[in-house]
């Protein structure tokens, strides 16, 4: 499950599926962050913090401390913070060490820094000590580029050709009768961590990009959320859904 704590990003990547911008002020508040973490932990043992660029949220490090404190009372929780690393300094090494210590040895607290010079226009000094720190992993490849957001304006990139929208698995499973925990656990065990998504304002989206429409809210009951998902319709990825077989369209109610 994704928690998007901001829609701001200054990197300006042309392949961005969210169309994140530097002048954006859409940041998750502490109140919503606490509710989002509680919601996530209720249904899923995996938490992925994202954005935009999550470190652009003015309360980023405070949020990480809140998160470490919350999971310290639990076991076998996996936290991944997805960042481009542009705001990290060597001083953050000590903060990351403290966060991982607070989270406890029974939990995983990982910072994943994705930096591929081909796609990321602002260079990062990868010789900094922070990028050698345990708990900070470097992703130097992007396996798939999605045809969404700002990326639609850049046909020079090679986009993968999906057989269905990113929301298909989650929507089809919940429409097929799975509850939220069963659906997200099945996805996690299949190596799929990016749906559903909690937006910066507390809304729930069934797709991966911040441009996906809102479906429900984190204070809704599970029965309300499932009902809204089952009744949900979206034409945002019509370039994909229009080419699906009839039985697959029926599986997500399109």
Model region roles, listed by residue range:
Residues 57-186:
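Conserved AdoMet/S-adenosylmethionine-binding subsite of the radical SAM
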Residues 158-254:
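Accessory C-terminal segments flanking Radical SAM cores
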């Amino acid at each position: 499950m994704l928690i998007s704590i901001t829609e701001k990003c200054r990197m300006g990547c042309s392949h961005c599926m969210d169309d994140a911008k530097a002048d954006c002020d859409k940041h998750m508040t502490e109140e919503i962050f606490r509710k989002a973490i509680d919601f996530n932990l209720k249904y899923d043992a995996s938490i992925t913090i994202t954005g935009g660029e999550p470190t652009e949220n003015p309360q980023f490090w405070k949020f990480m401390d809140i998160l470490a404190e919350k999971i310290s009372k639990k076991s076998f929780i996996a936290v991944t913070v997805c960042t481009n690393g542009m705001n990290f300094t060597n001083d953050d090494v000590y903060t990351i060490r403290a966060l991982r210590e607070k989270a406890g040895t029974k939990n995983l607290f990982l910072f994943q820094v994705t930096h591929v010079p081909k796609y990321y226009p602002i260079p990062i000094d990868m010789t900094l000590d922070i990028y050698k720190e345990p708990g900070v992993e470097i992703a130097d490849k992007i396996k798939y580029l999605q045809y969404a957001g700002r990326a639609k304006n850049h046909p020079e990139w090679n986009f993968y050709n999906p057989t269905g929208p990113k929301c298909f698995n989650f929507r089809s499973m919940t429409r097929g009768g799975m509850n939220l925990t069963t659906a997200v656990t099945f996805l996690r065990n299949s190596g799929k961590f990016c749906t559903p998504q909690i937006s910066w304002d507390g809304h729930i989206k069934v797709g991966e990009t911040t441009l996906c429409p809102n479906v429900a809210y984190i204070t809704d009951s599970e029965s309300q959320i499932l009902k809204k998902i089952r009744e949900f319709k979206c034409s945002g990825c019509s370039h994909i859904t229009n080419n699906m077989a009839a039985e697959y369209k029926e599986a997500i109610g399109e």
